[in-house]
A protein has these predicted regions:
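Intrinsically disordered, low-complexity Ser/Thr/Pro/Gly-rich regulatory segments
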Residues: 1-198
């Protein structure tokens, strides 16, 4: 097993978002420093082990394994975005992970969990997306991420969701023109359900 110092050095070489470091430090009741290296150096052993086992070793040892892996994937996909975990949105609720642009506009929302999703959880997420898109016009992507789940039943139900296209485009609301006629550009989000396999 690697020493704490070796783990910190390996983690420092990876671009770990500040939002993830803050989340793990808070969860493990660890102190933080200013900047990534300072924060990693000051984090307690459990926090370092959590990050290391999920990011470097790819070991599913903890409940937040998928959250850590998903966050790291988002960093590679949306490189200039800031990450926020358990992000509160007034009058809508919390989103598990969001990516924010430089103006703090929400551009990506993600819900992830280790176990199988129930349809009511997906339906609730979709309802929150409809409301959020009305406020956050820069929102372009939404992901539901699960681990080793059978998603066939949920995928079949997604086909029946109003505005959900077979190509993954989710139209949250048609824009209304003059006299209530449909016109203008609709509110669209790229919606994907991802399954991480072990």
């Amino acid at each position: 097993m690697k020493t704490r110092e070796e783990m910190v050095n390996e983690l420092f070489k990876i671009k770990i978002p500040a939002g993830l470091i803050n989340y793990i430090a808070k969860k493990e009741r660890s102190v933080l420093g200013a900047g990534t290296m300072n924060s990693l150096s000051k984090m307690n052993d459990q926090a370092i082990r959590s990050l290391y086992s999920a990011i470097i070793d790819d070991k599913e040892e903890r409940d937040d394994y998928l959250l850590i892996r998903t966050t790291m994937w988002l960093v590679s996909e949306f490189q200039s975005a800031k990450i926020s975990i358990d992000h509160p949105v007034p009058n809508i609720g919390d989103f598990r992970i969001v990516c924010l642009n430089e103006d703090d506009d929400i551009i990506v929302v993600v819900d992830c969990k280790m176990n199988q999703y129930e349809w009511n959880q997906i339906d609730e997420f979709i309802s929150k997306l409809r409301i959020l898109k009305e406020r956050e016009m820069k929102l372009t992507n939404a992901f539901v991420v699960s681990r080793n789940a059978d998603a066939s039943e949920i995928v079949n139900k997604l086909k029946d969701v109003q505005g959900m296209g077979s190509d993954g485009t989710f139209v949250t609301k048609e824009k209304q023109g003059l006299g209530g006629l449909v016109g203008g550009k609709p509110n669209k989000i790229n919606f994907s359900m991802l399954i991480e396999k072990s």
